[in-house]
Amino acid sequence: MLFKCGHNHAHSNGPANHAPASDAGGHTVKVEKLGVRTVDIHCHLHVPEADALLKDVMDLKNEPLLWFANDETRKFQMAHGQNIMPRATDTSLRLAEMDASGVDVQAISTAPNHYCYWAAPELGRDVAQLVNNKLADVVGEHPDRFVGLCTVPLQNPEMAVTELERAVKDLGMRGVEINADVAGNELSRAGLDPFWAKCEELDVIVFIHPSGFAKGD
């Protein structure tokens, strides 16, 4: 589980806030304090070092948001990515926006373009380890504001199990983020029984975040 329930739900920096339901446009707003802890479970951390590790093998076909798009949509997606990049990489900017938006805790997870299920298993493992170490660093610096959801190389279930165990037991991750398919294969067809068993054994949350879609055959 992400948290244990208790009477003191607010983080140590003060009473918790809550954004009004009318704020659906993605804008930072000044919010009313209601005395309950607000947790945002859908928050990505981008790790530039992972980009560097992947730069020689990246292909547009491996980026569904860009590949399955017309030119106008692709242009928008790329501009949007650049717009949010500072907040996805700079913890101080992230914390400032959390405070302004009334978010007490973020469950941070990898940016979907770093799933890398299309890559060779060893490269996927290296990227996962790099990203998970960075997630752990950010959580360790602000343990009252962040919890971590790790990433694992699902293209190799054995490696995925090993990395999941390391991330949970050694790095303190509370869960794992995965894609809704593994390089086009449905989760039910990807040989993931050992992974699901390890998730159950470790009692961790599985956050399924789609990026692209299965082959459909």
Question: Which residues does each PLM region occupy?
Answer:
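Helix-coil boundary/capping segments in enzymes
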Residues: 1-217
